[in-house]
């Protein structure tokens, strides 16, 4: 079930003395409950503008926005009341590149600030804040001030504050961009933990494909305000269609570069395949199994392993010798083994 539905959403900024800016153009995305949905693109692609339409920090000029089954926007017009929107926003947490902490208050006071309109007693409020600190591994920093914390610790405080009202959705807008690589990994691991333990749906805005690859299960690629490609992480990463996606991913380009360097020429009754498979599900040597089970000779030209959301995924480039019937049996065998097969020509183009 979709917890966020964006249908044909556009955002246009009107300017008096210059041409209008179309920041988001006709974007449709459906995000399922429990997804970690990565939205990736270069600076200025429209990612941050798009994610702000989910909680109406940015109102669309066209399209529909439905969150948690509640209509926010229809045909570019806000249909939810201000009071109801305020209530719904409490169920949509948000973190940013800048931590936006109150420097003159302690860590626990920063978290409590998000609960100032709650009905909790003082004791309940303190208990909840300590639980949130435990959740983000900062139990010993309750009385510290932001200036006494590292960047990663400050982002953990921001995450705890964003979780204060028990949101169903967390919007992460370039939340790791200001952090060093090791701290970035730690924050991404924390987001993955929150997704797993709380059932939290996360929308991850980033220009770093490695962040998406580490924790997301779905991804959309944006360019010039449009989504040029989207789908399951595995499908998009291992068989990218859009040119921009190929630049981000690099894997498809590696296959093409390999073929160019080898300058291969396929013989009669010889086919070239790209094989993609989960190493968790396919533990056997595919080339040996093809010879043993199908009786065809396969040669490996290229091999690579990517780790996508903790799943090791292998990519092989192989040639298979055999007549049309043998090729048909080969394709069926590979499909039955859970291998995704794409036939290529000698230049790496799909057939």
Swiss-Prot record:
Keywords: Amino-acid transport, ATP-binding, Cell membrane, Membrane, Nucleotide-binding, Translocase, Transport. One of its GO terms (molecular function) is ABC-type D-methionine transporter activity. ATP binds at residues 41-48. It is found in: Cell membrane. GO terms for cellular component: plasma membrane. Its main location: membrane. Its EC number is 7.4.2.11. Residues 4-249 form the ABC transporter domain. It is an enzyme of class 7 (translocase). InterPro entries: AAA+_ATPase, ABC_transporter-like_ATP-bd, ABC_transporter-like_CS, ACT-like_dom_sf, MetN_ABC_transporter-like, NIL_domain, P-loop_NTPase. Pfam families: ABC_tran, NIL. The keyword RNA-binding does not apply. It is a peripheral membrane protein. It catalyses: L-methionine(out) + ATP + H2O = L-methionine(in) + ADP + phosphate + H(+); D-methionine(out) + ATP + H2O = D-methionine(in) + ADP + phosphate + H(+). The complex is composed of two ATP-binding proteins (MetN), two transmembrane proteins (MetI) and a solute-binding protein (MetQ). Belongs to the ABC transporter superfamily. Methionine importer (TC 3.A.1.24) family. Part of the ABC transporter complex MetNIQ involved in methionine import. Responsible for energy coupling to the transport system. This is Methionine import ATP-binding protein MetN.
């Amino acid at each position: 079930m979709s917890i966020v539905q964006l249908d044909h959403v556009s955002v246009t900024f009107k300017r008096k003395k210059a041409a209008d800016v179309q920041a988001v153009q006709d974007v449709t995305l459906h995000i399922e409950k429990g997804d970690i949905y990565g939205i990736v693109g270069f600076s200025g692609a429209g990612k941050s503008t798009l994610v702000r339409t989910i909680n109406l920090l940015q109102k669309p000029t066209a399209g529909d926005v439905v969150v948690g089954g509640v209509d926010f926007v229809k045909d570019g017009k806000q249909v939810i009341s201000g009071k109801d929107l305020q209530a719904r926003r409490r169920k949509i947490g948000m973190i940013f590149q800048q931590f936006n902490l109150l420097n003159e208050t302690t860590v626990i006071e920063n978290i409590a600030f998000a609960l100032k309109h709650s009905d909790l007693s003082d004791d309940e409020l303190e208990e909840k804040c300590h639980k949130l600190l435990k959740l983000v591994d900062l139990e010993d920093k309750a009385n510290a001030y932001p200036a006494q914390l590292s960047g990663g610790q400050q982002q953990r405080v921001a995450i705890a504050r964003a979780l204060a009202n028990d949101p169903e959705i967390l919007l992460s807008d370039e939340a790791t961009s200001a952090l060093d690589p090791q701290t970035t990994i730690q924050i991404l691991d924390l987001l993955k933990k929150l997704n797993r333990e709380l059932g939290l749906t996360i929308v991850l805005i980033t220009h770093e494909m490695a962040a998406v690859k580490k924790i997301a299960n779905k991804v959309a690629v944006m360019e010039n305000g449009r989504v040029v490609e989207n789908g399951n992480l595995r499908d998009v990463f291992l068989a990218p269609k859009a040119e921009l996606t190929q630049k981000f991913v690099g894997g498809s380009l590696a296959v093409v570069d390999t073929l160019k360097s080898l300058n291969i020429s396929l013989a009669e009754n010889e086919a070239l395949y790209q094989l993609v498979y989960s190493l968790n599900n396919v533990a056997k040597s595919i080339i040996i199994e093809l010879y043993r089970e199908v009786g065809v000779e396969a040669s490996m030209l290229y091999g690579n392993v990517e780790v996508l959301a903790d799943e090791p995924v292998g990519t092989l480039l192989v040639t298979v010798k055999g007549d049309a019937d043998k090729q048909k049996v080969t394709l069926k065998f590979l499909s039955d083994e859970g291998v995704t097969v794409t036939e290529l020509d000698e230049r790496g183009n799909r057939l």
